[in-house]
Swiss-Prot record:
Protein name: Serine/threonine-protein phosphatase PP-Y
Record EC number: 3.1.3.16
Active site (record annotation): 121 (proton donor)
Similarity field: Belongs to the PPP phosphatase family. PP-Y subfamily.
Any single GO CC term annotated in Swiss-Prot or TrEMBL for this entry: nucleus
Organism listed in the record: Drosophila melanogaster
Amino acid sequence: MAVLTTHEIDCIIKELTSLNGSECTLKEELIERLIQQTREVIKWQPMLLELQAPVNICGDIHGQFTDLLRIFKACGFPPKANYLFLGDYVDRGKQSLETICLLFAYKVKYPLNFFLLRGNHESASINKIYGFYDEIKRRHTVRLWHSFTDCFNWLPVAALVGERIFCCHGGLSPSLRNLQQINHIQRPTDIPDEGIMCDLLWADLNHTTKGWGHNDRGVSFTFDKVIVRDFLKAFDLQLMVRAHEVVEDGYEFFANRQLVTVFSAPNYCGMMNNAGGVMSVSTDLICSFVIILPCHKYKMIATDANQMPTNEEE
């Protein structure tokens, strides 16, 4: 299969970023080549990415393509800004295809400035149920869906920013004793039912009970603020960033501001009326938040003034 030329990648990006609520007209053969090229890029990057700031960190997108474009308009289109996405690109929303194609195109175009982690919805068993499979089957073929899910099986699952900020989609794992265990996860792989990879993509916060708890999702665990504190101390980290749960203001702190949940799909599923958030990490690891308000209600984008230093004095 022929490698995409720079011109072809640019044309994909131009078409997608020019859409105004309509569906893209990318041909299946071109999308297939984009998928294969994305896989070749991500397979040479580790399961635990080690990134430098500045970077914008985004949570769940879930096929809300118009809101993804709003994020880029607010925070800067690549390569003017660096990005780390925490997973859950597909399902729920109406334009998973446009969403994942634009993210893949930017990954191919800017492989060292644009990073994609895996979420629990980047799995065949999940996105076959929650919308992605049906969308791809309706607009193209089941074969193309298989190509996407095969590529998802290569995505990294965690990242370190500036050696001090740990990022993943879901949460922590009782099996995680050394961060290099993450790099030892063999690819390609689907998401297992238990273990480190499962927990990194599925675990949730525990606001009521202590320690590790039962997860109502029926998979993985919940974890409390003491587990967060001990994890950060053990690995000389200052902050944990995760996604996976809707939060009203687009971001929400936990564990005495040692953990923050970032969720980037405003008015999730057209009914939650939540804001979307993006965490902006400066070169000196000062974190601030860009808030994407539900466009149906506010028709605007606002920048939050709440800044959080992650240096030793705080």
